[in-house]
Amino acid sequence: MTSTLTERPRTDSDLGKPWNVIVLNDNHNTFQGVAFALSSTLPGVSYERGLKIADRIHNIGRAVVWSGHKEAAELYWESLRGFGLTMAPLERAS
């Protein structure tokens, strides 16, 4: 007996889109603390760049600090939360 495989259409139109790690503004983290957390966690983010991102978070209320594969996004999200940063839920990039 032989069987045939039929290909099912993909139902996830967002397949392959990156995930955003978003830090929210709060009233308990300092610019220096945010910069340290970002530079300690995210690849390619220096302390100086972390200060610029912290300023953006403060002025806008939130910032996408990293975007990429879901597994890495989850790891970075947990690490930043561990530093005490206020995190938005992971979001799919648009």
Where are these regions (language model features)?
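Terminal domain-initiation and capping elements
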Residues: 1-94
